[in-house]
Amino acid sequence: MGYNTNWIDEILRTGVSHVHNLMFKGGTAKTNYVVNMNYRNLQGIFHKSDKEEFQGRAEVNHSMFDDKLNIKLQLLANKTGYTSTTDGGSYDTYSWRQAMIHNPTEPIKNADGTWYENTGIFNYDNPMARIYESDGQQDLQQIRISGNVAYRPIKDLTLNALLSYDRISQTGGYYETKHHISTVRDGRNGYASTGSANNMTKLIELTAQYHKTFDGHTVQALAGYSYQQMNYNRQYEQNYDFPTDLFSWHNIGVGQALKKGLATEYSYWLDTNLIGFFGRINYNYRDRYLLMAALRHEAASQLEGTHQPWGNFPSVSVGWRVTNEPFMRNQKVFDDLKLRAGYGVTGSQPSDSFLGKSLLGYGDYYLYNGKWIRALQPTQNSNSSLKWEEKHEVDVGVDFSILDYRINGTIDYYYRLIKGLLYDYSVPSPPNLYTTTRANVGEMSNRGIEVMINAIPVKTHDLTWSSTITFSTNTNKLKSLSNDLYKTSSDYFMTGWIEEPVKTESHIVRIGHRVGDIYGFKVVGVDDNGKWIYLNHEGKEVNYDDFTHAFEDKQILGNGVPKWYLGFNNQVKYKNWDLAVNMRGAFGFQIINGVRMFYENRSRQDWNRLRSAYDKVFGKAVLNTLCSEEFNSYYVEDGDYWKIDNITLGYNFKKIGKYIKALRLYATVNNAITITGYKGIDPEVTTAGLNPGYDNRDIYPHTRSFTFGTVVTF
């Protein structure tokens, strides 16, 4: 068409943000206060991606009766608002995809000023029209109030009462105009949605703590009770087919779709409770031998109707500060050396409620005796054997310091065994009411090492350089998903999803293996015509035309969980100057490059493609246009990276004039440099969950920001 449209540049901008902080404090010997206020006005890199936030914090402390009674009051108030270009979210990431695939020879608008849309191509929208013909706003308000009263009736006993109330309320609305693609292509004739959500948490915690020191012995004992009540409610409605765009989402009832039963509305309400009794004992002998033992006894309303709504979670740890032993007094190596070990159990209640009971739900409408009615049907089997998920952890470690405390650090080894993982098991119906039953019989283990080293390599009168190195590694394994009663039909299940047009699972979870295994077809080359050559499950090479893409030919192509992480933080101070450089990296993992998978493929002639789509695959031939988009090993890459996360340079002025006690000027670069062999935009992708390591093509890219600021102390 003769145009030269850079669609990426059109939807992006340089975001300019400003942040303001104000803190003041004061008081007397008996009463003091601190007030913090923060205002943030943030522009995203996409058009119509704006956020405004105000937050205030206040804390007041007061003591009386010779410091026997101490009262603390805390208040947090937060108000956040952000624009929305997608229903129920913030930014429409689908517009990013459309900018990537859009033909640069097409215009943004027609000659008459209307948006140019090529509706003859499937899933091909004008990204600028998607952004500017949608309008939404999300507003969030939070209020948190807490009060703490501590009373010391006798010298060694402290009674404490904590009360808190936390409420988060969110309201939002969204509208797509009659010029949006949803009308142009789908005929919705204007679309609106509104919704609200409220989260409320109330907490009361009562404790009594006893502290006694005698003849080198120190004993601390704590006993307590806690009760937490949580409420969550939400309502949502949508409508379309509006007479005008003037109302936006503010008059949602005038749309015709809801009246015709074609739109959606629903509401939701959930109450949960958590009650607990707990105790802890700490023992210390001359700061040499340390012991801690604790027990929590908790019940959760999510387990109502089961035989085990209560759980017991013990923990114990021991420590030996070797450097305080008499035989270590004359040694010159360690300034401090402490050996420690611990074992503990923590519990996690299910996120869903009523899991122990049979549930019924409303099905579809059907005609009965001349009337449309909805039938009740089973939606969940009861399972009175459900219980808390438990994490059993063993930890051994050492803390040390050498060279007159110039180098200190910690080294830890841990082993975690999670028992009672929830999983949905297929069961016969009848005799069961429903075809699946949820039970917690799975087991998963994690083991790893965590190291942190702090050092001061240089320390003179004017110059100080301090560094922190962190290292961690973790290996997990799914140990079991079955017991004598509940068994899986196979030793694996598929998870993850690669969206249309590929539409296939991306990961496999297998008993006895790591979580995060990437599972797909392995290619070893292309033929002279640019068609894939596969390696089947027998290890034989198969040409594209003869390959059946059978499930049994899929193989493990990598793992999306890094084997180890490394961090290196540095701070240099020279007179009034200071420089901080923070770096980190992840290593030993693979990434599915979704951008290359879709945009290096030449089978879709109506999409824009990456220039690399015309590179020779495996250095032999350009990929044949008959090879449609698919997920295979060619698009799985090593994800190792090293990032210079943050660089901050600052200068500190001493007292200026009569009123300014201190002044600091600084400049910061975030997400400064990334060193990687990965071909995608950013190797830092999601590494959590069951399908880690997928670089989705519809994702808000990480940004690089430059900040200039000042801190004034009066």
Describe each model-derived feature in a short phrase.
Residues K643-I675:
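C-terminal structured "cap/appendage" subdomains that terminate the fold
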Residues M1-Y3, G44-K51, Q55-Q142, L162-I275, ...:
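Surface-exposed loop/interface segments of Gram-negative outer-membrane beta-barrel transport/assembly proteins
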Residues I11-L12, V19-N41, I45, R57-S63, ...:
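Predominantly transmembrane beta-strands of Gram-negative outer membrane beta-barrel pores used
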Residues K563-F589, Y635-K654:
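C-terminal substrate/ligand-recognition segments
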Residues K51-S63, P309-G319, L663-T674:
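Short secondary-structure subsegments characteristic of cysteine-rich extracellular domains
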Residues L22-G26, A58-H62, G147-Y151, L206-Y210, ...:
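Residues on the lipid-exposed face of transmembrane beta-strands in outer-membrane beta-barrel proteins
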